[in-house]
Swiss-Prot record:
One of its GO terms (biological process) is 'de novo' IMP biosynthetic process. It comes from Citrifermentans bemidjiense (strain ATCC BAA-1014 / DSM 16622 / JCM 12645 / Bem) (Geobacter bemidjiensis). It catalyses: (6R)-10-formyltetrahydrofolate + 5-amino-1-(5-phospho-beta-D-ribosyl)imidazole-4-carboxamide = 5-formamido-1-(5-phospho-D-ribosyl)imidazole-4-carboxamide + (6S)-5,6,7,8-tetrahydrofolate; IMP + H2O = 5-formamido-1-(5-phospho-D-ribosyl)imidazole-4-carboxamide. This is Bifunctional purine biosynthesis protein PurH. It comes from the Bacteria. Keywords: Hydrolase, Multifunctional enzyme, Purine biosynthesis, Transferase. GO terms for cellular component: cytosol. The IMP cyclohydrolase activity resides in the N-terminal region.
Amino acid sequence: MAKIGRALISVSEKTGVVEFSRALAGYGVEILSTGGTAKLLREAGIAVKDVSEFTGFPEMLDGRVKTLHPKVHGGILGMRENPAHVAKMQEHGIEPIDMVVVNLYPFEATVAKEDCTMEDAIENIDIGGPTMLRSAAKNNRDVTVVVDHADYAVVLDEMKNSGGSVSRETNFRLAVKVYQHTAAYDGAISNWLGARTGEGVAPFPDTLTMQYKLAQGMRYGENPHQSGAFYVEKGSRESSISTARQIQGKELSYNNIGDTDAALECVKQFTEPACVIVKHANPCGVALGANIMEAYDKAYKTDPESAFGGIIAFNRELDESTARAIVERQFVEVIIAPKVTEAASEIVAAKKNVRLMECGFWPENPAPRFDYKRVNGGMLVQDADLELFTELKVVTKRAPTDKEMEDLLFTWRVAKFVKSNAIVYGRDNSTVGVGAGQMSRVNSARIAAIKAEHAGIPVQGAVMASDAFFPFRDGLDNAASVGVTAVIQPGGSMRDAEVIAAADEHGIAMVFTSMRHFRH
């Protein structure tokens, strides 16, 4: 085990550093420090030696050069069990540094500010910090390196139990954490600077660097013969499947996570109380109601057969009555809501395998983000599809009634989350039938009608949403044959005139959005 005799402490994020330093001093550890950290520790009554005194060389260039010195890096990198290293250290008066406690300038927080300039960004690129961290991590057999204040307690507990030493096993784990941290730090700098050109900000950097943290292992992946795991974005704060808290139930599976993400992101679109039921990443029942009990009841009745073993998402607090209705009515894999009442949690607890999730509430307007799709040997990157339409243009002789327009906008939101080719029939803010994932758009329309008939729900008087344009009039003819009265679609087909004429023939009102919502 490595006995700690001297520690260099220099941190931007100062949470817990005073208490940690005081505890180190209690073990007789000499503390070296710089700048604001040294000032803070002295004000707390802790003895500190400035790094400039330790090296015999002053800080210079407005603080850009503080720790870049052989006495610092020799003291960190010198191998204690290597006689040649020890001899050279003695020859040059280099004293060992046994612990490095450093975190880095807040580059990501700086560039996240709207008024951040290039100068601000450059000045928040840490040089000495990463260099010390990497040096200490390289020599982890002899040096303890701490980059995360969450590890202060771990280190102190080990020192308490070992008389002031830290094990090589702990040092190795902390060193790995350092390289993960510096990789993410350099990646953030690379991504931000790489998007800056002489002509402004490019939408995508030349090189994209990302880091995800292992959140959980899994019994298997999408299928039992595949291994799987779940990684989450570092520092993610948005209400999502990645930040949700599991209250009870079995461990989330690979498919559970994908389906719950689809359900939650769909239900987030609605401001009224809403319920979304998803099966295999497709909404099979979506509805709005005066409350979530009504919304759930309507959504379930759309397609009770497909709802079996599905994922249920709400945009309101899950209450006792709704929880009871779910567990008494159907088998469900996951229930997710922004908040769960204690009474609702107790009801669901009767079904111990049901995964109950609480994700927190979300802002009305989501922050822009990227979507990623892995392909063999590469990755597709795009803006997330957060917009709804470019315009609402009535293109037929008959305009939709106010009630039809309300249902059109409802089904349009649902269609965004149905796999293409997507057709959604809806009425009274509830899905009537969903046709998903067909290679032919007219077949998706036929399937939506079949689903409605199977559930005993008449399509007559319903509206229809299509995620992309109709290439031929057959989609409109099919809609008319089952009683659809209004249609919403992007438009943009070379046969738009033919499709509009078909709608007029059938007395169907049609609205173009000028925005497609393919989903693959």
